[in-house]
Amino acid sequence: MIEKREEQKAELKENGELDFAYSIAGFHRVRFNVFRQRGTYAVALRILSFEIPEAKRLGIPPSVVDLTNRKRGLVLVTGPTGSGKSTTLASLIHIISETYAKTIITLEDPIEYLHPHSKSIVLQREIGYDSKSYASALRAALREDPDVILVGEMRDLETISIAITAAETGHLVFSTLHTNSAAATIDRVIDVFPPHQQQQTRIQLSGVIEGIIAQQLLPKEGGGRVAAYEVMLATPAIRNLIREGKSFQIQSMIQTSKKLGMQAMDDAIYDLYICLLYTSPSPRD
């Protein structure tokens, strides 16, 4: 722990900011963001529970929970910073751990939720402490015989490329992006690659993607916040749109595929409003 603190002090001094999590016995786990301002330091705190929230409590749709039964492929949870992506992923990983005897490796910056071993073995690596980067940790994970890999964030071309390869080679990969819809997520992944690689990437992505969940947090009746989820599932029609570069048609496909478990964001928000969970009088604005 002393060694880690010295590394964190050096990082804070060099970069002017530091993001980390710390467990306080008998209280909670806390995520800290320390940053320099006007010659001194400030800190933003986020309280994390030791208990991993259940999917039902979070309002995660059953079709999303069903993605935990996949043996391979890529599942992306997207949304703006602070929209609850890490909590959603923690809940899904917990379901796998409680249901199957698998090896799960999580790569996080920092580690937020602590996963106990259950039927699965859960190995959690922190970027900047246990490994230098997401890309290097993900590359190493492929040699560590996991069944499931959680990548906290796909930040660059190298990480995205390795994540796709991992999904192609028989792993179930979960990760996040800062995009607001399934269509925008597909475009973001493709656009990271050089033009001459984009068509091949479309083909690869269409073959490995299993689902994209875009989420946002909305004010809740009586205080607090509630999550709304857009859900895209990789049907043959969706895979074909990705392969042909027609991501602009994905939204309409989601809207017409509700019976298959898909859900448009507008519909999710409207349903929350009808259930009196969302306070806005104009949920479709």
Residue ranges and their predicted role:
Residues 1-280, 284:
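Short, flexible helix-loop junctions that flank or precede catalytic/ligand sites
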